[in-house]
Design a protein with these regions (language model features):
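Gly/Ser/Thr-rich loops at beta-strand to alpha-helix junctions
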Residues: 37, 103-105, 197-201
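Active-site-proximal, Lys/Arg-enriched surface segment
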Residues: 66-148
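Extended hydrophobic secondary-structure segments that form protein cores and membrane-embedded regions
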Residues: 96-99, 153-157, 192-196
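An internal, acidic/charged active-site-proximal segment
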Residues: 161-232
């Protein structure tokens, strides 16, 4: 019971993201379901682990597309709370963030944002093309209780398969930069971003440097060097 009291004291800081107390109540129950469930059966696992009746199933579903939850405000509350709950790993005065993309296979025929995706890192266990969601995520590097470092997820968004405007010509790199800036502006701190070689691009580096942030990554192998032709 002591653990749940501490848990609730933490979750209450997310209250500004909900327009009504009832909406916040169902969000708390949803978070409880995520923390306690023993299987990955979706909303059904929430109903099962919380010992609710079947009527609660649709209540949980309504929360995920409810206008009573402000996603941007919820993300800002969580990003701000992470600096209180955890001891962030720093390089100088900079917070260290990790960024990566993931393609999650989905089989739902009518599931929103599912599209035909190409996986650059195909292997024997990963097909080259899949149907699924393409997401990009940012985490905060923190000190663990045992002296190790851990990554705390901050935010994640589906960046392919959703078209809000035909005039939106942003690439995945541009969308990741915007996602990072939405996190950094909440902290009002400079960030050191660590990412793989896919993000070693001018579209990432230039906006970061303009805002005072930095990128640590592996250089791509597509650079070309040459010597001038000697005079004969």
């Amino acid at each position: 019971m002591t653990l749940w009291i501490e848990w609730l004291q933490t979750v209450r800081y997310l209250r500004p993201a909900c327009s009504r107390s009832r909406t916040f109540f169902w969000m708390v129950l949803t978070l409880m379901g995520f923390c306690c469930r023993a299987d990955n059966a979706g909303v059904t696992s929430f109903v099962r682990v919380l010992n609710f009746r079947g009527e609660a199933y649709h209540r949980f579903l309504h929360l995920f597309h409810s206008k009573g939850v402000d996603l941007d405000m919820l993300t800002a509350c969580w990003v701000r709370l992470c600096l209180t709950l955890f001891r962030p790993f720093q390089v100088g005065q900079r917070l260290v963030c990790l960024a990566d993309g993931i393609k999650a296979p989905k089989e739902g025929k009518r599931m929103p944002a599912v599209k035909y995706l190409h996986q650059q890192s195909a292997s024997n266990s990963k097909p080259e093309y899949i149907m699924g969601h393409s997401l990009q995520a940012i985490s905060l590097l923190v000190h663990g209780s045992g002296g190790q470092v851990a990554a705390v997820p901050l935010t994640s968004r589906i960046h392919e398969g959703l078209v809000f405007s035909n005039r939106d010509a942003r690439t995945l790199l541009d969308k990741l930069v915007a996602l990072l800036f939405s996190v950094a502006v909440v902290w009002d701190r400079k960030v050191l971003l660590i990412a793989d070689a896919y993000y070693a691009s001018g579209n990432i580096i230039r906006p970061l440097l303009a805002k005072g942030h930095h990128l640590v990554t592996r250089a791509k192998s597509n650079a070309v060097a040459f010597l001038p032709v000697p005079d004969v």
